[in-house]
Regions:
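Soluble, non-membrane globular domain cores that form compact, hydrophobic packing
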Residues: 31, 52-55, 252-254
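Short acidic, Pro/Gly- and aromatic-enriched capping/linker segments at domain boundaries
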Residues: 45-66
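Internal hydrophobic scaffold segments of catalytic domains
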Residues: 30-35, 109, 115, 188-197
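Positively charged, low-complexity intrinsically disordered regions
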Residues: 3-4, 8, 12, 51, ...
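Sec-dependent bacterial lipoprotein signal peptides
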Residues: 1-30
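Acidic/His/Gly-enriched intrinsically disordered linker/tail segments
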Residues: 131-156, 160-161, 177-300
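Juxtacatalytic substrate-recognition/specificity segment
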Residues: 61-183, 267-274
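Bacterial Sec signal peptide processing site at the extreme N-terminus
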Residues: 28-48
Length: 300
């Protein structure tokens, strides 16, 4: 893999658009580890992470000043331009999520570590979290010090998917600050919704195309039983996104069910399954989901 150029974050070029063609071997995805290394249903979350082995590759920071953007603090070993459109967009992400999901604001600081090459990122993640599958980015929460600034971290690298990956991981972080827990499928579905550019209104063109090609059999009850990220493959991520998009954009009754469920999750990490609540409000959720997907048009 070729190294990302420092021009990614220079004062003359926008962060997201100065990236050339980069070959990727990492897939988007999530992981959750409990305090003793036991998997939990929180997406892309590692608790008790600080107890792991020291790393040979250092995480970014110390060479350049950190950049504070709202509740996010960015660290990199190359200069970061505060006026970059990416940072302006990320500064608006928490309010966008709060408004859409009817959730309160969280005040936790999220530390974001931007490696300047894929090699450095992979090396650090292999050394620090050797049991994790390869992913382009991770959200990490250390449960040892609740509400401390350093507890919430995002790790990623400056590749061509940086903008999408940061929206995705920071969505996890924002949800983590206000919810007591969130089912894996819902965590991923919401992150998949908000990882899209605001102009897309949560619509993922790639997911939509693949789901409409045929062979898609939605089964929310099955998806709700997926507890480990290792069992979340691309079809599961697509279906999770589809259900969230349907709830938020396809049916007013479904949106109310989701909003109520999220309110329950603020105090109760396990308020039961969403699927029975959805069936009680929507006569045929599967048929309604198909109709919703059929009506969508990819953004131009």
């Amino acid at each position: 893999m070729r190294r990302a150029s420092p021009r990614l974050v220079s004062r003359s070029k926008p962060l997201a658009w100065a990236v050339g063609s980069v070959a990727l071997s990492l897939a988007a995805g999530c992981s959750a580890i409990g305090p003793a290394g036991k998997p939990t249903p929180l997406a892309e979350t590692l608790t008790g992470a600080r107890a792991q082995v020291p790393t040979a590759t250092k995480k970014p920071g110390g060479v350049q000043p950190a950049l504070r953007v709202g509740q996010f603090v960015f660290y990199a070993d190359v200069p970061l331009e505060p006026s970059d459109p990416l940072f302006r967009e990320l500064d608006e992400l928490p309010e966008r999520i709060q408004r859409e999901l009817r959730l309160p604001a969280g005040n936790n600081i999220v530390q974001v570590y931007l490696f300047d090459s894929q090699e450095k990122y992979e090396s650090y993640m292999r050394d620090r979290f050797p049991w994790l599958p390869a992913r382009r980015a991770y959200f990490v929460s250390d449960g040892k010090r609740p509400n401390a600034a350093e507890d919430l971290q995002v790790y990623t690298w400056m590749g061509e998917h940086l903008r999408t990956d940061l929206r995705h991981e920071l969505t996890h972080a924002i949800l983590h600050t206000v919810l007591a827990g969130v089912p894996l499928w819902l965590d991923e579905g919401l992150a998949g919704f908000f990882e899209q550019p605001p102009a897309n209104d949560g619509l993922n063109p790639d997911h939509l195309d693949k789901l409409r090609r045929g062979g898609f059999t939605p089964d929310l009850a099955r998806l709700e039983n997926v507890k480990l990220v290792a069992d979340m493959e691309k079809p599961e991520y697509r279906e999770a996104w589809a259900w969230v998009h349907f709830c938020l954009r396809g049916d007013d009754r479904a949106r109310l069910v989701l909003h109520d469920y999220l309110q329950q999750l603020r105090a109760n990490p396990a308020p039961g399954l969403l699927s029975p609540k959805l069936r009680a409000a929507v006569t045929d959720p599967k048929a309604s989901l198909f109709e919703h997907l059929a009506r969508q048009r990819n953004p131009e």
